[in-house]
Amino acid sequence: MFIDSVNLTLSSGHGGAGAVSFRREKHVILGGPDGGDGGDGGDVYLIADNNSHTLAAYKGKRALKAQNGEAGSGRRMTGKKGENLELIVPPGTAVYDAQTNELLADLTKESERVLFLKGGKGGLGNVHFKSSINQAPEYAQKGLPEETRDVRLELKLIADVGLVGFPNVGKSTLISTVSNAKPQIANYEFTTLTPKLGLVEVDEYSGFVMADIPGIIEGASDGRGLGLKFLKHIERTKILLYMLDLANHRSLKEQFVTLRGEVEKFSPELAKRDFAIALTRMDAAENLERKVGEFLQILGLSGERSNLIDEAGKAGKNLIYKQDIYEFDDSKPYFVMPISSATNQNITELKFSLLELLKKGKFQMIFAGNLTETRG
């Protein structure tokens, strides 16, 4: 089961008490104090691990606690430190205060390790309290208390490309065509009920991670449909690929305006990310050239005919709008491309174009054969 949010009460370990003890040896009549210190309580760590994919391990658990430190003992023996509590979480996990929603930790990298709560310090044994006026102290410190915090763990998937579209627009079909992901595919809305990640190999040396997010409907930013539960998963994506259905009863303009509006309402910052547009089901569309031409005109791209790729003999190729990557205007889509996952039309061009945009992007890619550049 895909679990992307859990509430927990986390506690470190209580420090062990110091010991009150005196030397008791043969021929030593008045042995001095020899009480050892208490052991420190265990700490709480958060560790990001790529082998962890959901927060399901913590479902149904309300409280997790590190081990308490053991008490000290005679002969100046220090108590054993409490065992640490280590929470293994997927990269992309954010930790919030359950009451205030304050972000407390954000684990985005493999093997990232965060000390979240420090264990209580062990108390000092009575050996520390001997003085010239008190040769036999019968006092030792108690260990310091543990730290406790009510938290909410939220997983936000990390991907290079996030697919944004209405239900049943072909996102699952595309990701299964271009990557190793195998999502459930059927001809009804909300086939994808959990986000899926797929590794897209563009060539022998490079590729990227694509996220298939459950379909957005109008009002998603207000919680309708699958709503906010999954919109958050596109927050960490480097670029957005809006997918519009050429064979849908809604116009391309209506689809794009609605999707763009929902993303903007959810996060104005997210709406500023580099983006591109894929027009799906070109094999089933009527009046393909007219629909694409009208949509480009609506986007203010009709005067950019020099950016339309025209290659004879390849159906649909002459309908691809694409910017010059070195003169990229990020207020416009990098490309508008009709595709068909069913017939593989323009799929190769789509993969290479997305990789081009990622390599010119502002962020480092998760998976690539070469170091990526940053746009100046």
Curated annotation (Swiss-Prot):
InterPro entries, per the entry: G_OBG, GTP-bd, GTP-bd_Obg/CgtA, GTP1-OBG_CS, GTP1_OBG_dom, GTP1_OBG_dom_sf, OBG_GTPase, P-loop_NTPase
Subcellular location: Cytoplasm
E.C. number(s) listed in UniProt: 3.6.5.-
Obligatory cofactor(s): Mg(2+)
Keywords tagged on the record: Cytoplasm, GTP-binding, Hydrolase, Magnesium, Metal-binding, Nucleotide-binding
Pfam families xref list: GTP1_OBG, MMR_HSR1
Domain Obg: 1-158
Binding site for GTP: 165-172, 190-194, 212-215, 280-283, 340-342
Keyword Acyltransferase: no
Molecular function in Gene Ontology: GTP binding; GTPase activity; magnesium ion binding
GO process annotations (BP): ribosome biogenesis
Main location: cytoplasm
Cellular component GO terms, alphabetical: cytoplasm
Annotated ranges, domain OBG-type G: 159-359
Residues annotated for Mg(2+) binding in this entry: S172, T192
Quaternary structure and partners: Monomer.
Protein role: An essential GTPase which binds GTP, GDP and possibly (p)ppGpp with moderate affinity, with high nucleotide exchange rates and a fairly low GTP hydrolysis rate. Plays a role in control of the cell cycle, stress response, ribosome biogenesis and in those bacteria that undergo differentiation, in morphogenesis control.
Database matches in PANTHER family: DEVELOPMENTALLY REGULATED GTP-BINDING PROTEIN-RELATED, MITOCHONDRIAL RIBOSOME-ASSOCIATED GTPASE 2
Similarity comment text for this entry: Belongs to the TRAFAC class OBG-HflX-like GTPase superfamily. OBG GTPase family.
Protein name: GTPase Obg
Underlying gene: obg
